[in-house]
Amino acid sequence: FLPGLLAGLL
Protein backbone atom coordinates (compact mmCIF):
# COMPACT_ATOMS: atom_id res chain seq x y z
CA PHE A 1 0.00 0.00 0.00
CA LEU A 2 1.36 3.40 -0.95
CA PRO A 3 1.52 6.25 1.60
CA GLY A 4 -0.32 8.47 -0.85
CA LEU A 5 -3.30 6.10 -0.89
CA LEU A 6 -3.37 5.90 2.91
CA ALA A 7 -3.32 9.70 3.17
CA GLY A 8 -6.06 9.85 0.52
CA LEU A 9 -8.29 7.55 2.57
CA LEU A 10 -7.83 9.80 5.58
Swiss-Prot record:
Q: GO terms for biological process? A: defense response to bacterium
Recorded GO CC terms: extracellular region
Sorted alphabetically, the keyword list is: Amphibian defense peptide, Antibiotic, Antimicrobial, Secreted
Q: Where is the signal peptide?
A: none
Compartments where located: Secreted
Q: In which tissues is it expressed?
A: Expressed by the skin glands.
Function field: Has antibacterial activity against E.coli HP101BA (MIC=12.3 uM), K.pneumoniae PTCC1388 (MIC=9.8 uM), M.luteus PTCC1625 (MIC=8.3 uM) and S.aureus PTCC1431 (MIC=10.6 uM). Has no or very limited (<3%) hemolytic activity at concentrations of 15 ug/ml and 60 ug/ml, respectively.
Q: Which family does it belong to?
A: Belongs to the frog skin active peptide (FSAP) family. Temporin subfamily.
* Name of this chain's protein: Temporin-ECa
